């Protein structure tokens, strides 16, 4: 297992959710957090954490993200080729863009490609816009890239 210097990485919280368990005495709340970490130099990871308090869920998600770091192969400031990936009901399409285009991405796709260090890319999210599935589809697409 590789060890990364956490100071180099930035964290972005994509989603915080509240889940409820109804018990005899009322409702019990727990929180979930979806976090992306990246160093803007080709390393990016996604993590999911659950806890009774929001800060604990975020901390667990960050720890999980560092366990799931992947390397993204780039070609200059963009990606080498088109890639389309399906993850559950979410589909994501990534296309290389010419220099100066910028990151054209929406929702939870944008922080992933930015933290991966990609500066010029066109993306389209198709199907379900469930943030957890869109994030996982984007990570899957980035791992399929050939340098």
UniProtKB/Swiss-Prot annotation:
GO terms for biological process: translation. The keyword Ribosomal protein applies. Residues 9-72 form the S5 DRBM domain. Gene3D superfamilies: 3.30.160.20, 3.30.230.10. The keyword Repeat does not apply. One of its GO terms (cellular component) is small ribosomal subunit. Keywords: Ribonucleoprotein, Ribosomal protein, RNA-binding, rRNA-binding. Disulfide bonds: none annotated. GO terms for molecular function: rRNA binding; structural constituent of ribosome. Pfam families: Ribosomal_S5, Ribosomal_S5_C. The N-terminal domain interacts with the head of the 30S subunit; the C-terminal domain interacts with the body and contacts protein S4. The interaction surface between S4 and S5 is involved in control of translational fidelity. Part of the 30S ribosomal subunit. Contacts proteins S4 and S8. Belongs to the universal ribosomal protein uS5 family. With S4 and S12 plays an important role in translational accuracy. NCBIfam families: rpsE_bact (TIGR01021). This is Small ribosomal subunit protein uS5. It comes from Campylobacter jejuni subsp. jejuni serotype O:2 (strain ATCC 700819 / NCTC 11168). The gene is rpsE.
